[in-house]
């Protein structure tokens, strides 16, 4: 219909622009809540005032000023309430993506105007349109300005006259059955009725987050990674740290330690919303720097393997290095040959594998005792004692468990609570030993679908949460202080990408709390929805920007998030799939399928991906 028309007219509210509340009258409730007025009474008064103003002036559309004049007797601050209503309209209005896409298409080759029956003034409507990034229209025709309405039909006649068009040359698009469809049709104007999707009856502000992002997110031509950080990572990290803050307040915990390395970004986000009540500290620890010293406190190989699980694809020589040992330390062992050192644990016979693990446990205990002294000194220096919380990305609890063993072997009293993004499958090993809570879900209290969804994106999340420095190996004394000894930083080349994503996320937090200091009443977990959507159905742009990033660590086989690999080479393709960090994205990129998550679910059972 657009292609056959010379003049295209769009309705504004509930067509190009939506409100994040169920009904327009809910805006009045929000104003009442802001001024601590009885919400139901003010909403009723505001509606009655509008009806009275319309009865008083039947010549055309009324103005907001006319409505609030009828409220002055009951509300002495009526003028202030009117400005609050305008400000609330700015806040709750957001672009309807479905219709703005149609609007942009029409703007390419047609004369486009906006036609609305609305009591808000032209400057206010123009500001709402600007906030919603709706531009390119030729003219704005408002009933409040022209004293003509679509409902009466005279506003359409005015539009035709002003644009020098005949009725059959015009198309009007809007949501109201009478004023946007039947009336223009009766004037020989082509009309299309848009039916907005129904909003859920049990929710007041369902699309608050999506509406905010639609209004505030950087433009498409902005830096891709910053925009991704703002629209996807930002809500996710905000939801996580808001949940942490709520929990800390509820349980009267002031001291918080953020575990390196993911904790660097988490602390940066937490500091945006935290007040002076909390003592936030960044703690240089790692799985290696905690679990190796903790081995000094245990007495069996099974406990050793809980702390230092050995993966089949890791070489023997690399595992020795991770433990802070050298191959020469095992020179007296019969298995210590170059051929064996270069094998992966998956290539070893079971008897030889057990012998090597037993030797490692014996040797590392000696190393662990030396490292434990410095680690305890570092923990005392950082005041890791009394009642405190520890925060990490996740997943299984080995670091918190190791810290528990280390602190238990000291004389310092402690009461530790841990926070994860989620508790994953291996958490069962430590669930009876540590106190820990998951933001998205706790171990054993999650649906298989959500568990699978998060599992599919673990490598992407770990990359996005990465710090600006290498992992902590151990500790050393320097100038009277205990300092972390850091490994080489593996993400130096791609850190600008990480930083851009994280900067975008922090910008989101600042913007969101600036507009909604109380979080807009959105449950904390709901903020993870944009991230879950990306994990469930990765957009092609996201795959192409992240797929070729190498996320390998621990000296393993190179792992790319979702590298391009032709299916025509099956063995290579299978190997690439098994080694990919983000398998759903890998499947979608290489198979061009919209069912990548379902395929991942099936293939994971086969390949144990």
Name each region found by the language model.
Residues 2-45:
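Active-site neighborhood of HAD-like aspartate-dependent phosphohydrolases
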Residues 19, 27-31, 103, 118, ...:
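Nucleic acid-processing catalytic cores of prokaryotic defense/repair systems
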Residues 45-66:
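N-terminal accessory alpha/beta regions
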Residues 59-114:
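Short, acidic loop-to-helix structural element flanking the phosphoryl-transfer center
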Residues 113-115, 119-169:
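Substrate-recognition "cap/lid" segment bordering the active-site pocket of phosphatases
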Residues 157-173, 181-182, 186-609:
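Long, low-complexity, Lys/Arg-enriched
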């Amino acid at each position: 219909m657009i292609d056959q028309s010379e003049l295209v007219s769009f309705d504004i509210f509930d067509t190009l622009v939506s409100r994040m509340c169920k009904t327009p009258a809910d805006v009045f409730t929000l104003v009442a809540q802001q001024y601590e007025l009885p919400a139901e009474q003010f909403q009723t008064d505001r509606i009655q005032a509008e009806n009275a103003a319309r009865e008083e002036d039947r010549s055309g559309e009324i103005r907001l000023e006319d409505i609030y004049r009828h409220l002055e007797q009951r509300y002495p601050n009526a003028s202030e309430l009117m400005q609050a209503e305008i400000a609330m309209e700015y806040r709750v209005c957001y672009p309807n993506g479905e219709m703005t896409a149609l609007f942009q298409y029409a703007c390419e080759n047609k004369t486009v105007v906006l036609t609305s029956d609305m009591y808000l003034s032209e400057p206010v409507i123009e500001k709402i349109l600007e906030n919603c990034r709706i531009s390119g229209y030729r003219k704005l025709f408002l009933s409040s300005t022209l004293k003509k309405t679509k409902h009466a039909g005279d506003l359409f006649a005015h539009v035709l006259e002003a644009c020098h068009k005949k009725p059959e040359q015009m198309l009007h698009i809007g949501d109201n059955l009478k004023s946007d469809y039947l009336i223009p049709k009766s004037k020989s104007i082509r009309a299309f009725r848009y039916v907005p999707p129904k909003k859920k009856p049990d929710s007041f502000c369902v699309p608050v987050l999506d509406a905010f992002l639609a209004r505030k997110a950087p433009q498409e031509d902005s830096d891709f990674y910053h925009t991704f950080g703002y629209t996807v990572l930002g809500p996710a990290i905000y939801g996580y740290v808001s949940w942490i803050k709520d929990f800390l307040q509820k349980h009267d915990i002031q001291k918080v330690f953020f575990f390196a390395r993911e904790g660097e970004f988490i602390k940066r986000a937490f500091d945006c919303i935290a007040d002076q009540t909390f003592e936030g500290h960044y703690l240089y620890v790692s799985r290696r720097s905690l679990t190796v010293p903790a081995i000094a406190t245990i007495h069996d190989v099974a406990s050793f393997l809980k702390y230092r699980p050995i993966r089949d694809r890791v070489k023997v020589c690399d595992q020795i290095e991770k433990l802070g040992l050298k191959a020469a330390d095992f020179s007296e062992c019969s298995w210590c040959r170059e051929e064996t050192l270069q094998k992966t644990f998956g290539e070893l016979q079971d008897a030889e594998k057990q012998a090597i693990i037993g030797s490692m446990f014996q040797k590392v205990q000696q190393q662990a005792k030396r490292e434990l002294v410095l680690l305890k000194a570092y923990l005392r220096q950082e005041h890791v004692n009394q009642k405190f919380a520890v925060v990490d990305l996740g997943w299984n609890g080995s670091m918190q468990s190791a810290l528990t063993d280390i602190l238990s072997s000291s004389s310092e009293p402690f009461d530790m609570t841990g926070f994860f993004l989620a508790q994953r499958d291996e958490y069962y090993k430590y669930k009876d030993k540590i106190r820990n809570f998951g933001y998205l879900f706790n171990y054993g209290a999650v649906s298989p679908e959500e568990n699978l969804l998060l599992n599919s994106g673990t490598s992407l999340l770990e990359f996005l949460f990465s710090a600006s420095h290498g992992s902590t190996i151990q500790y050393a004394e320097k100038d009277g202080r205990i300092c972390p000894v850091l490994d080489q930083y593996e993400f130096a080349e791609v850190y600008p990408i990480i930083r851009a994503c994280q900067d975008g996320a922090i910008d989101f937090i600042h913007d969101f709390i600036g507009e909604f200091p109380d979080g807009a009443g959105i449950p904390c977990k709901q903020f993870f929805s944009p991230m879950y959507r990306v994990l469930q159905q990765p957009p092609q742009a996201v795959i192409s920007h992240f797929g070729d990033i190498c996320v390998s660590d621990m000296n393993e086989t190179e792992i790319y998030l979702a590298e391009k690999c032709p299916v025509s080479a099956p063995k290579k393709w299978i190997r690439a799939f098994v080694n990919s960090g983000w398998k759903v994205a890998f499947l979608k990129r290489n198979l061009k399928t919209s069912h990548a998550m379902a395929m991942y679910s099936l293939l994971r059972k086969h390949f144990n991906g």
